[in-house]
Protein backbone atom coordinates (compact mmCIF):
# COMPACT_ATOMS: atom_id res chain seq x y z
CA UNK A 1 0.00 0.00 0.00
CA UNK A 2 1.07 3.60 -0.45
CA UNK A 3 0.95 4.26 3.33
CA UNK A 4 3.31 1.36 3.91
CA UNK A 5 5.69 2.62 1.23
CA UNK A 6 5.69 6.10 2.78
CA UNK A 7 6.42 4.65 6.22
CA UNK A 8 9.23 2.50 4.84
CA UNK A 9 10.68 5.46 2.94
CA UNK A 10 10.90 7.34 6.26
CA UNK A 11 13.37 4.68 7.46
CA UNK A 12 15.91 6.34 5.18
CA UNK A 13 15.46 9.69 6.90
CA UNK A 14 15.72 8.38 10.45
CA UNK A 15 18.92 9.16 12.23
CA UNK A 16 18.27 7.06 15.33
CA UNK A 17 20.15 3.80 15.40
CA UNK A 18 22.53 2.46 12.81
CA UNK A 19 21.84 1.69 9.17
CA UNK A 20 22.20 -1.96 10.11
CA UNK A 21 19.37 -1.64 12.64
CA UNK A 22 17.23 -0.03 9.94
CA UNK A 23 18.17 -2.89 7.60
CA UNK A 24 16.90 -5.42 10.13
CA UNK A 25 13.72 -3.44 10.70
CA UNK A 26 13.05 -3.32 6.97
CA UNK A 27 13.80 -7.02 6.43
CA UNK A 28 11.61 -8.02 9.36
CA UNK A 29 8.77 -5.89 8.01
CA UNK A 30 9.10 -7.64 4.64
CA UNK A 31 8.94 -11.00 6.39
CA UNK A 32 5.92 -9.95 8.44
CA UNK A 33 4.14 -8.89 5.24
CA UNK A 34 4.74 -12.28 3.67
CA UNK A 35 3.01 -13.93 6.61
CA UNK A 36 -0.13 -11.79 6.31
CA UNK A 37 -1.37 -14.13 3.56
CA UNK A 38 -1.22 -17.86 2.86
CA UNK A 39 1.83 -19.15 0.99
CA UNK A 40 -0.46 -20.54 -1.74
CA UNK A 41 -1.74 -17.00 -2.39
CA UNK A 42 1.85 -15.74 -2.77
CA UNK A 43 2.58 -18.57 -5.17
CA UNK A 44 -0.47 -17.68 -7.25
CA UNK A 45 0.52 -14.01 -7.33
CA UNK A 46 3.99 -14.89 -8.42
CA UNK A 47 2.88 -17.08 -11.33
CA UNK A 48 -0.22 -15.42 -12.73
CA UNK A 49 0.56 -13.11 -15.63
CA UNK A 50 -2.24 -10.73 -14.65
CA UNK A 51 -0.36 -9.93 -11.41
CA UNK A 52 3.17 -10.01 -12.82
CA UNK A 53 3.62 -6.24 -13.18
CA UNK A 54 2.34 -5.55 -9.67
CA UNK A 55 4.47 -8.36 -8.23
CA UNK A 56 7.58 -7.05 -10.01
CA UNK A 57 6.90 -3.47 -8.90
CA UNK A 58 6.45 -4.61 -5.30
CA UNK A 59 9.64 -6.70 -5.41
CA UNK A 60 11.62 -3.82 -6.95
CA UNK A 61 10.47 -1.43 -4.21
CA UNK A 62 11.67 -3.78 -1.46
CA UNK A 63 14.92 -4.55 -3.30
CA UNK A 64 15.71 -0.86 -3.76
CA UNK A 65 14.99 -0.03 -0.11
CA UNK A 66 16.94 -2.98 1.25
CA UNK A 67 19.89 -2.28 -1.08
CA UNK A 68 19.97 1.33 0.12
CA UNK A 69 20.17 0.26 3.77
CA UNK A 70 22.78 -2.40 3.02
CA UNK A 71 24.97 0.18 1.26
CA UNK A 72 24.50 2.62 4.16
CA UNK A 73 25.49 -0.15 6.58
CA UNK A 74 28.62 -0.75 4.51
CA UNK A 75 29.43 2.98 4.57
CA UNK A 76 29.10 2.93 8.37
CA UNK A 77 31.63 0.08 8.48
CA UNK A 78 29.03 -2.41 9.72
CA UNK A 79 29.02 -4.68 6.65
CA UNK A 80 31.98 -6.18 4.84
CA UNK A 81 33.27 -3.98 1.99
CA UNK A 82 32.83 -6.73 -0.62
CA UNK A 83 29.06 -6.82 -0.07
CA UNK A 84 27.27 -5.35 -3.10
CA UNK A 85 23.97 -3.96 -1.83
CA UNK A 86 21.69 -4.58 -4.82
CA UNK A 87 22.72 -8.17 -5.53
CA UNK A 88 22.82 -9.05 -1.82
CA UNK A 89 19.33 -7.56 -1.40
CA UNK A 90 18.12 -9.66 -4.36
CA UNK A 91 19.48 -12.87 -2.83
CA UNK A 92 18.06 -12.14 0.62
CA UNK A 93 14.59 -11.26 -0.68
CA UNK A 94 14.48 -14.22 -3.10
CA UNK A 95 15.51 -16.64 -0.38
CA UNK A 96 13.06 -15.22 2.16
CA UNK A 97 10.24 -15.57 -0.38
CA UNK A 98 11.27 -19.16 -1.21
CA UNK A 99 11.36 -20.03 2.49
CA UNK A 100 7.86 -18.59 2.90
CA UNK A 101 6.56 -20.45 -0.15
CA UNK A 102 7.99 -23.66 1.32
CA UNK A 103 6.10 -23.05 4.58
CA UNK A 104 9.03 -22.18 6.82
CA UNK A 105 7.85 -20.65 10.08
CA UNK A 106 8.14 -16.93 10.59
CA UNK A 107 10.69 -17.55 13.36
CA UNK A 108 12.81 -19.70 11.01
CA UNK A 109 12.80 -16.95 8.40
CA UNK A 110 13.71 -14.27 10.98
CA UNK A 111 16.58 -16.45 12.20
CA UNK A 112 17.77 -17.07 8.64
CA UNK A 113 17.75 -13.34 7.89
CA UNK A 114 19.60 -12.52 11.10
CA UNK A 115 22.20 -15.21 10.39
CA UNK A 116 22.81 -14.01 6.82
CA UNK A 117 23.14 -10.36 7.85
CA UNK A 118 25.39 -11.30 10.77
CA UNK A 119 27.57 -13.34 8.38
CA UNK A 120 27.97 -10.29 6.13
CA UNK A 121 28.78 -7.97 9.02
CA UNK A 122 32.14 -6.63 10.14
CA UNK A 123 33.29 -7.27 13.71
CA UNK A 124 31.72 -3.93 14.68
CA UNK A 125 28.48 -4.92 12.94
CA UNK A 126 28.42 -8.31 14.69
CA UNK A 127 28.88 -6.60 18.05
CA UNK A 128 25.91 -4.31 17.28
CA UNK A 129 23.77 -7.25 16.20
CA UNK A 130 24.65 -9.32 19.26
CA UNK A 131 24.05 -6.39 21.59
CA UNK A 132 20.46 -6.13 20.31
CA UNK A 133 19.57 -9.74 21.23
Language-model segments: what does each one mean?
Residues 33, 51-76, 86-94, 101:
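Amphipathic alpha-helical packing segments from all-alpha helical-bundle domains
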Residues 29-31, 80-119:
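Hydrophobic alpha-helical segments that form the core
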Residues 6-36, 88-89:
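Hydrophobic alpha-helical connector segments
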Residues 8, 12, 49, 77, ...:
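Short amphipathic alpha-helical interaction patches enriched in hydrophobic/aromatic residues
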Residues 42-50, 130-133:
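Short linear capping/connector segments at secondary-structure termini
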Residues 29, 125-133:
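Charged, low-complexity C-terminal accessory regions
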Residues 1-5:
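Short, basic, alpha-helical segments at the C-terminal edge of helix-turn-helix-like DNA-binding modules
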Amino acid sequence: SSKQRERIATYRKRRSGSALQRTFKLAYEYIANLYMVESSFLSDLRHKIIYADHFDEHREFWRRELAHHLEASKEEGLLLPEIEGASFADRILETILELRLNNATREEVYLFCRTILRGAATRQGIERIDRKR
